[in-house]
Amino acid sequence: MGMTIAEKIIARAAGVDTVKAGDIHTVEVDRLMSNDGTTHLTIDMYNNQLKHPHIADVNKLVWIVDHNVPSDSPKTAASQKKMRDFAREHGIAFYEGQGVCHQIMMEKYVCPGELIFGADSHTCAYGALGAFGTGVGCTDYLYAMVTGKSWVLVPETIRFNLTGRLPEGVYARDLILTIIGKIGANGANYKAMEFVGEGMKTLSMSDRISICNLCVEAGAKTALMEVDDIALDYLRAHGREPKACFSSDPDAVFSAVYDIDLGSIVPIVAKPHFVDNVCPAGEAAGTRIDEAFLGSCNNGRIEDLRVGAALLKGRKVHPLVCFLVVPASQAVYQEAIKEGLIQTFMEAGAIVMNPNCSVCWGSCQGVIGEGETLISTGTRNFKGRAGHRDSFVYLASAATVTASAIKGEIATADML
């Protein structure tokens, strides 16, 4: 019986010839990423709960401060200092203020065929480069950090066969929100979501990252794509060569298969308070907003900023809307400066912030108050996610978010 991409990566990491869904294997973890959201807890466990604390391979560790940058309180500063001091003591690769963790990982570390643990749920983004990325909690992270290994229950795989091309003004963000709405927030619980088909050739790396990144919002254990020339070009442009590129075998077993015509996708919003609560953006048009956010690990790349800046050129942000623009990394920020995008945003009245998680994380920049409404390219719209528990978050593409910031109400680009 053939194997899926997920099964092949696990088999490689486990040092066995074959695995199948439902098996449990001990695996060698190729890389371990953690951010300032929870790393302080890992450090406390390392220092206080281990008889013989040590790190199996410090070269596998990447620590990134991105959730509260710069620190917003003495408590946050102390937590980040703990992280910084530990990294200095042990020689851990450390990034602060350089961008959102998943963007940095994609730019600098992720390679096809790797099995990567991240102390963040959106680690599944790494599947855009054919890596098995999955989020773990502090205990599992610490075990892998100390032993270099962990256990994995081999997931079933849902396959999405993409055909056609997205219409003009429709984006990968609209596609993945459509899929999540179709299968539901629990539709891929502990399963791998695999994307293949001729339609993949029309999707850029930025598109692919956006798709894989949000798969956890359908409950997915991971998301995976085959490594093609587009992925290889991205990898090599960032100074890396592939280690192992996998495709599913013709006789691999899938728990479900969906055929999706990209040409049928329309602009989408996810309404409060669930990511699968989706509707065509036009149905939510006219909903007044107080804030708009263009950024995050899902939609803060240069391609997203280009979309937003193109719509803002010659226009102004609505006077009663706070429009936050947050590049996903310093590399993205610098490119946006070179292309004049930052100037366009500032002339239009947007607030351009340093690269970080910003309001998507909802604990520092741009949090919204009681009764306020945010439209966001962030990852989640749960109650209280972006501030007050009694606020409202709509999720949408960079184009819809920018158009809404201009109009002062939810709108699509063709409504400008």
Regions found by a protein language model. Give the residues of each.
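Fe-S-dependent hydro-lyases/dehydratases of central metabolism
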Residues: 1-416
